[in-house]
Amino acid sequence: MPLRMFITLFPCIAMNYRKILLLSLGHLSCDLNSHALPALLPYLAAAHGFDYQTCGFLAFAYSAVASLVQPGLGLLADRIARGWFIPLGILMAAMGIGATGFLSNEYAMFLSLVIGGIGAAVFHPEAARYANIVSGDHKGVGLSIFSVGGNGGMLMGPVIVMLAVGGVPVGSFTFGGFGLHGTAAFCLLGIIMASVLFWRVSAWDMAARTPKARSGSTGASNDWRAFGILSGCLLTRMGLTVAFTTYLPLYWQGVFHASASTGNLMLVLFSVFGVASNLTGGAAADRWGFRRVIRWASFLSLPILAIFPLVTTPWLAGILLAPLAIALFAPFSSMVVLGQRYLSKNMGFASGITLGVAVSVGGMFAPVLGWAADAWGSLALAMHLLTPLAVIGAVCACFLREPKEA
C-alpha cells in the first residue's frame, strides 16, 4: 500500500508517522534475526555435524535469553531511559546472529547467540516506550504499526537466510548463496539500521525524557492487579496464536491431505490476514477503546475455534482463517498499550512482559497440543483444546478495567 494512501486511511498518525514507521523498521531489523535462526540451523548442522539436541541448545540461547531477560532490562530502561538502547539492541542482535557463520565451536556460537538475545531484550522495552510516546493520542494505531514491524521480521529473516546463505537458482545462475559466511548480511543490515536510528533517536531523546513523557513521572502509578488480569488475556492469546500457527501447515497436510506447499501457503495467508488485523485493531482501539477491542476479539475467537476442527472441507477452513486472524491479532496493540498504562511508572517493564515473557510462556502450549495430537492420534481432535484456552482469555477480558488516571 503506498504511503500516502496509508496516511489517508489513518490520518491520525500523519503528525508522527515518520517516527512510528522508523521504529517499526527498527523492530523489523531486530526481529528478523531471531526468526532467521530456525532457517539457519540446518546449514549449521550440515556444516558442523550438530545433532538435534545441539540445535535446540543454540535456539534456546537466543530465544530464552531474549524473552526472560526483557523484564529486567525493561526495569533498567525505566530507571535510566536512553534512546541509544534502541540502536544498541539492534546492533547486538545482528552481530549475535551474523557471527555464527564464522564460528566453528558450538559453545562460541552459544555465547554469540546469548549476546544476540540480550540485544533483542535491550531493544524491545525502550523501543516500545518510544513508540508509546511518539504515538501521541493515537496509541492503538501507533503500537500496531510498531508491532507489524515484528511481523515483517518474522517473514524477512528466513528469506535473507535463503538468499544470502543458501542461494536461489535462476537458470544456470545462482543468486546469492555465499554459504555460512553469508550471515555477514545480518551484520551489515544491523550496522546500517543502528546507524540510522542512533542519528534519529538522539533528536527525540530530550522529548522522551521530559516529566510528561517519562514513564516514571511524578503522578504515575502502577495497577499490578489489573496488569495481572491483562497478563492472563495475553498469555492465552499467545498460547492460541503460537499453537495454531505452529500446526496450521501440518493440519492442512494431515486433515485435508494437501501438499506441504499448500499448507505453507495457508500459513502465509494467515500471516497476511494477521498483519492487516493488527493494523485495523489498532485503529479500532483508538476509536472504540482498548478494552472493548480485546473483549470483542476474545469472544469472536470462541465460536471460530469451536467450529474449525469440525470443518471437513479445506475451502471453508480457509475462509475461517480471516475472522480467526482478526480475533487473534487485532487486540495485540491494545494489550501492549493497556499494559503500559496499568504500569505507567514502569512502561519498560510492562513492555518486557508483553513483548517478551508472554511470547515464551504462551508458546509453551504448542508442545501440549502436539502431545495431545500424538496421544489421541488426531490433530483435529487436539485442536479442540484451543477452545477452553480461549474461554479463559475471554473471562479475563471481562474483568479488565480502565487504567487509573495519573
Where in this protein do the model-derived segments appear?
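Helix-loop-helix hairpin linking two adjacent transmembrane segments in secondary transporters
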Residues: 145-203
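Interfacial helix-cap and linker-helix signal at transmembrane-aqueous boundaries
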Residues: 44-45, 76-77, 160-169, 174-175, ...
